[in-house]
């Protein structure tokens, strides 16, 4: 038996990463995403489509930021900064550590979303991109 024949008769199991989980999460969120500014999601304005580059399927509709959105985000950040600074290093570290742990807890979902949105191999998203994002907060 040749290698080619072996490959043609091999049975493959399902991959541990399944896009259905990420697609269901997107649908559960309403498939429409605004901006997170000043502690809450903003209403949608003009939107653009996020498409799976492998299939062309529309994954979600994302709000296109306007100058007013950017101004609101900067204003919220400036308002929050004194309180954040006054919290002290230990309190800020606890918040950032908690954020890193949430990224870690949901790493498979983030990897699937990244793969669907960018078309990159799941291995790259799972083993490089998501862990790198987590390390930014440790």
Residue ranges and their predicted role:
Residues 1-61, 94, 98, 131:
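Terminal low-complexity tails and localization/encapsulation signals of metabolic enzymes
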Residues 57-138:
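Glycine-rich loop-to-alpha-helix module at the N-terminal edge of alpha/beta enzyme cores
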């Amino acid at each position: 038996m040749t290698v080619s024949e072996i490959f043609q008769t091999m049975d493959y199991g399902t991959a541990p990463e399944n896009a259905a989980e990420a697609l269901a999460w997107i649908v559960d969120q309403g498939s429409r995403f605004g901006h997170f500014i000043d502690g809450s999601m903003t209403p949608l304005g003009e939107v653009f489509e996020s498409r799976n580059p492998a299939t062309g399927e529309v994954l979600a509709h994302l709000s296109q930021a306007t100058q007013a959105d950017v101004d609101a985000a900067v204003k919220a950040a400036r308002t929050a900064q004194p309180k954040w600074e006054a919290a002290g290093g230990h309190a800020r570290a606890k918040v950032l550590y908690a954020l890193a742990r949430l990224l870690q807890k949901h790493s498979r979902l983030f990897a699937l979303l990244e793969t669907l949105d960018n078309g990159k191999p799941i291995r790259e998203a799972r083993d490089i991109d998501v862990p790198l994002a987590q390390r930014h907060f440790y």
